[in-house]
Amino acid sequence: MFPLNFHYEDVLRQDLLLKLNYANVMEVPGLCEIRVVPKAPYNFIIKNGKLAMEIPCGQKFIQTQRGSTGKSFRSNPFLGSNKDKGYVSDLARQSTLRGHGMSNFLVRILTVMSLLDFPVEIRKNSIQFSMETEFCEFSPELEDHFEIFEHIRGFNVTIITSANTQDETLLLWSGFLQKDEGETQ
């Protein structure tokens, strides 16, 4: 288990239980997933996007098969498929992280955010921010592949939580940031 998971289970979850006055520990909000979308031109994403997203996210992409009926939401131009090039949304180019991959990526995000100042937008059940290419400078595994990232203008990151209100999301996010600050001091 990652230290961030221990922090959530042992410290943050109990703190939120008391602050939000919940009767049941299962009501306490947690992290569900992290969505990462590269800010790059469409033609770059087709050619190099798969590799550019695999390296920082730490997970291998798999090609999904399109169903036989009509347009499929699983048709993913980000993976280099030649299907349905008419409409491409950000959802078609995103990487979704859950479980250990999410925890590992969140540790990296918190480390970079403690060094740089990224504006964060906190909503009802999500935390959104844009990471510029400086993220690459703080990740040793990315420095070896800078030619892939030189055309990416950064990443849009959305952290989805199970919170019901913006205040719950804010408390959850500030708890993770305090954990990171506590380790660096």
Curated annotation (Swiss-Prot):
UniProt-listed Gene3D superfamilies: 3.30.1440.10
InterPro entries in the cross-refs: Ribosomal_uL5, Ribosomal_uL5_dom_sf
Molecular function terms from GO: RNA binding; structural constituent of ribosome
Listed GO CC annotations: cytosolic large ribosomal subunit; mitochondrion
Alphabetical keyword list: Mitochondrion, Ribonucleoprotein, Ribosomal protein
GO BP of this protein: translation
Primary location group: mitochondrion
Organism domain of life: Eukaryota
Location in the cell: Mitochondrion
Additional note from the record: A stretch of 270 kb of the mitochondrial genome is duplicated within the centromere of chromosome 2 resulting in the duplication of the gene. The expression of this duplicated gene (At2g07725) is demonstrated.
PANTHER family in the cross-refs: 60S RIBOSOMAL PROTEIN L11-RELATED
Record family assignment: Belongs to the universal ribosomal protein uL5 family.
Subunit annotation: Component of the mitochondrial ribosome large subunit.
Name assigned to this protein: Large ribosomal subunit protein uL5m
Organism per entry: Arabidopsis thaliana (Mouse-ear cress)
Gene name as annotated: RPL5
